[in-house]
Structure formats: C-alpha cells, structure tokens
Regions:
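PRPP-associated nucleotide enzymes
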Residues: 1-304
Length: 304
C-alpha cells in the first residue's frame, strides 16, 4: 500500500493531518494524531451548516471544487481510482456516502461520473440524489450496485461493525435496502484495523493516503512519538494509561454530550488496564465530581 504523494502533501499542507495530545477515536481507542480530512476544503468548517441536508452539502462540495484547486485534485484522484470499481454487471450503479463528511467527497465523485448519489443518514433515512437539484426520499434501490466513499477509515466501525447484533454501519444499511456493495474507498486510512474489519463484511477497502511510518516520518512534527505509537498503538496506549490515567478523556463522559458511544467503547477496550493500574477510581471520582452522576449510570459497558 502506497500513498498518492500529491494527495499526501495536500493532506499535510491543509492541516488535515495534525499531531495531537492523546484523544479518543470513534472506535474508543486512543489516538495521538488526528486526520480531519474535511480541512482539505479550506473553508473554515463552513460545510457544517449543511450537515443535515445531503443535497445542500453535495452542491456546496461542488462549489468548493471551483474555489479550492487542491480539493479538486483530491476529487480527481478519487474519481480516477473509483471508476474502475463500478461493476458492469448491474443496470444501476451509484456512489454512496454517509452523513456527514463522507458527502464532501462522495458527492463530487458521483457528479464527475454522472451517476446517482446515495445519501445515508445517521437516523436511517436514505436519499437518492440524481443531480444538483433533485433528491428522492426512500428510493427503490434493489438490484443496484454502489461504491461507498468516505473521508477517513480508522477501525471502520461506521462503515461496518460486526460488534453489534445485527451488524451496523453504512454497508449493512445499503445492503438492507437491496444495494450490492463490496468496495469502500476513503481519502485517508489510519491503518488501525479498518481494512481487516471491512474484510469481515466482504468489503474491499481502498485509500489514497495511508498514515504509515513513511508518512509520519515525513509529515509529523513529533515523528519519534508518532512512529512508536504506529508500531503498536495498543502497547503505547496501555503505557500511557498506566502512567497518566484517563482524566484527559473525561469530556467524552458528559451525559449530555455526543461522545457516549465513544466513551463506552473506550471502557470496553481499556477498563481492565485502568483497574489493574489503580486508575479507575480516579476516573470514577472525576466523572462524579464534574457531571454529578456515577460513571456506571452514564456509561453502561456492554450496552447499546
């Protein structure tokens, strides 16, 4: 797996890759660098005003292609790589993307290829976008084929998660609607198990940029730390938790916040380490003090 060197440089120059203090990823694992692929739009996150309207988001992304040439370069590269993946065994083919940031990349690719875009919403709604001004709710999608396009893959859980029963994610959502999907293409891969996870769901994962040791040595501001983490994220994370505890992640346990699934997954992965290191009681006390509720009332490990 080799990164597209031009897209890798755009990702770095735009701040779409950045070194961070330890934080929680959507998978519940700990990360020390972050990939905000949407920053390649260079729009100051203005896209967020369209985050609940896929048609508006797709039209906005098309506008950004003309306003930001380097963003258009990414769409060029995606389109070139995705086009051969479209199966000629189906009468209807489409590009699919999930709410919200997938749409920034999946929409323009669908427009370039002059094929429909399947917009997947977190609440289960599906729209079929035929062009810049037409959206169909609850479309008939049976016997069609789609390639999923995303902004980023880490563990791949938003695309396909076998941990839930039944499995969840954009791919099961498409398949439940009658769409055949066996390819997913993202701008950036963190190479943290997402490809292997999607393979369990019979989905081939592809990316333009891979956050591997070569990328980190070239683009990280702290390459020694980044490469050490990259070589064994779990070992690095365990050492961090034993030495520092989990207080840096306390905001994720806000009972009124948006990261409770992330917090639950964190505990599922790491609570045994915190207990063994004598750090769990410190987290429980901090959560109770800050949010006024016991940790086990806010986050039920093993729950939905």
């Amino acid at each position: 797996m080799r990164s597209d060197p031009r897209v890798a440089q755009i990702v770095s120059d735009s701040g779409a890759y950045s070194d961070k203090e330890p934080l929680l990823l959507a998978s519940g694992k700990i990360g020390i660098y972050y990939s905000n692929t949407e920053l390649t739009l260079r729009d100051g996150n203005a896209y967020k005003k369209h985050e609940n309207d896929s048609l508006a988001m797709l039209n906005y992304a098309l506008e950004r292609e003309f306003a930001e040439p380097t963003f258009a370069e990414i769409i060029d590269a995606l389109t070139e790589r995705v086009k051969p993946l479209l199966s000629d065994r189906y009468e209807e083919v489409a590009i699919a993307g999930g709410q919200t940031r997938d749409w920034l990349f999946s929409g323009p690719v669908a427009a370039r290829l002059a094929i429909p875009h399947i917009s997947l919403y977190k609440d289960g709604k599906i729209e079929l976008i035929y062009g810049p001004g037409e959206a169909e709710l609850e479309p008939r999608l049976r016997k069609s084929y789609a390639v999923h396009i995303g902004d980023l893959i880490t563990s791949g859980s938003s695309t396909y998660s076998p941990l839930e029963n039944p499995s969840t994610g954009w791919v099961p959502m498409l398949r439940a609607a009658g769409v055949t999907v066996d390819n997913s293409f993202t701008v950036v891969s963190r190479l943290q198990g997402g490809e292997e996870n999607l393979a369990q769901g019979n989905v081939q994962s592809n990316s333009l940029v891979f956050i591997d040791e070569d990328f980190l040595r070239k683009h990280s501001k702290n390459p020694e730390r980044a490469v050490a983490y990259k070589k064994d994220p779990d070992a690095w994370s365990e050492q961090y938790l034993r030495e520092n505890g989990a207080l840096a992640f306390i905001a994720n346990f806000d009972p009124n916040g948006k990261n409770l699934v992330r917090a639950r997954r964190f505990l599922e992965h790491h609570s045994h380490i915190l207990k063994d290191a004598g750090r769990m009681k410190g987290l429980e006390a901090a959560v109770l003090e800050q949010f006024g509720k016991p940790l086990d009332e806010i986050v039920v490990v093993g729950g939905k």
